[in-house]
């Protein structure tokens, strides 16, 4: 049994970093699994539901914008990854990671360059993390519509930067990422 851990969402100006870890059955036949960035939002949503239904186990980890600012994006990403892995049951025998080795994890790890395009399990973890984060940003948009998080997902689009300059940072903005915009 293997697990895939995928970091996601390091570049946005707002919102948490989200990591996914997925254990797929050995005989998994989920079609169209690929790098989440190469899939349409509709296809990611469809695949998310299939993954959640068929996976042996799924773990999701988060690191808040405040935590990102406190310890830096890389360390916050590692924390989210460790949280995601810790939620898996059963515990995996090996981790296939998208190009990284996660510190403080005792499970053997295999970093794979462009892993989300080369491993269906890493692709599944990528999709779970991206859909989870995108859904969270849509919820934030309901509370803070002026930033248009539903459309920009916290990334630095022109409309997002204009809103940031007009309204200032929200509680979910990453202060260390927006210093040259405010």
Task: Kindly label every feature range from the protein language model.
Residues 1-182:
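RNase H-like, Mg2+-dependent phosphodiesterase core
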């Amino acid at each position: 049994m293997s697990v895939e851990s995928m970091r996601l969402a390091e570049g946005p100006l707002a919102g948490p970093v989200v990591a996914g870890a997925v254990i797929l059955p050995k005989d998994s036949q989920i079609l169209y699994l690929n790098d989440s960035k190469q899939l349409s939002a509709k296809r990611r949503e469809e695949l998310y539901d299939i993954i959640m239904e068929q996976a042996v186990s799924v773990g999701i980890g988060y690191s808040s914008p405040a935590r990102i600012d406190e310890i830096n994006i890389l360390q916050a990403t590692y924390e989210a990854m460790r949280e995601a892995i810790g939620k898996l049951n059963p515990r995996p025998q090996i981790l296939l990671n998208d190009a990284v080795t996660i510190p403080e994890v005792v499970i053997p790890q295999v970093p794979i360059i462009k892993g989300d395009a080369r491993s269906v399990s890493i692709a599944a973890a990528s999709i779970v993390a991206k859909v989870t984060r995108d859904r969270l940003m849509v919820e934030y948009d309901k509370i803070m519509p002026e930033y248009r998080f539903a459309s920009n997902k916290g990334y630095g689009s022109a409309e997002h930067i204009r809103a940031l300059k007009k309204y200032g940072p929200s509680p979910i903005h990453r202060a260390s990422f927006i210093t040259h915009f405010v």
